C-alpha cells in the first residue's frame, strides 16, 4: 500500500517538473519571437513613411464632421482650399478653361495643382439650404445684393461658427432658449416661422396657443432663418414643416477654417454688429466689384494673406450630419 502511495507522489512530482520545463521553454520561445519582431520594427522604422488615416465619424447632431487625414504640417503643400463662387461668375467669364488658368496661378502662390477646388452655387438662398465646407481652408465669395443683406448676414453667421443641433418636435413640446448662444436654425425651400411666448401658466402672451394666426411672425418664406427670442421664456412655435426643418442649436464657437469675402457693396456686412455674435471681422472681408476675372485675380494674389487669419481645422460643415444627435 505504501509503495503505491510513493509511486503516485513520485509520478505527480515528475509531471510537475515536466510541465514547468515545458512552460519555461514556451516562455523562452515567445521572448525570442517578440524581441526579434521588435528588432525588425526598430530597424525598418526610419525607412517607412506612414500616414494616419482617421475614420470618418460624423458627429450626428452637429453640423461638423471630423476629418483627420494628415501627418504633415506644411500649410500649402498638404492642405486643400475650396473656393465657393456664385453661378453668375462662370456665366460672365464664359471660358471653359478658366478653372485651369486659376489653378496654374494658385500654383505660383504655393498651392499645388489639385489642392484647390472650385465649388459653384446658384445663389445665396440656395447655398444656405445645404452648405458643405469640406476643405482644410474654405473661402466663400458672396456678391453683394442690397435685397439679400439679411440672407448674407445669416449665412455668414451660420458658416463662420460651429453649431451643435437637435431636432425639434414643435407639435408636442414648447421650447425656450437658454442663453445667448442658443438659437433656432431653420433651413428649407420656404421657411415661415411664427412664435407665441408663454407665461408661467403656459398661456400665450399676446397670442392664443390654439390659434397660429395670432402668433408673432419672425420670418416669412425664407430659406435660412436663425431665430433669436427672449431667453428663459417658453414658446409655442408654428413652422411650415412641409418645406422647412427647424432645429434647436447651440453656437460652439468660431469655425476658423472659413472666410467670407463680400464682393462689392459700399460697406462690408458687419455681422459683429449683431449682439448675438462675437467679434470676428478678420474672417469677414470685402473686395471691390469690377469683373469676376478681376475678383479671382485678387483672391489669387492675396490668398496666402487670407489664409493667415484662418486656422486649419479637422472639422467640415455638412448639413447632412446636422439633423440628428445621438
UniProtKB/Swiss-Prot annotation:
Q: Which UniProt keywords apply?
A: Calcium, Capsid protein, Disulfide bond, Glycoprotein, Host endoplasmic reticulum, Host-virus interaction, Metal-binding, Outer capsid protein, Signal, T=13 icosahedral capsid protein, Virion
Q: Which Pfam families is this protein grouped with? A: VP7 (PF00434)
Annotated Ca(2+) 1 binding lies at 95, 206, 214, 216
Q: Which residues form the signal peptide?
A: 1-50
Glycosylated at which positions?
Answer: 69
Q: What family classification does the UniProt entry report for this protein?
A: Belongs to the rotavirus VP7 family.
What is this protein's name? Outer capsid glycoprotein VP7
**Annotated source species:** Rotavirus A (strain RVA/Pig/Mexico/YM/1983/G11P9[7]) (RV-A)
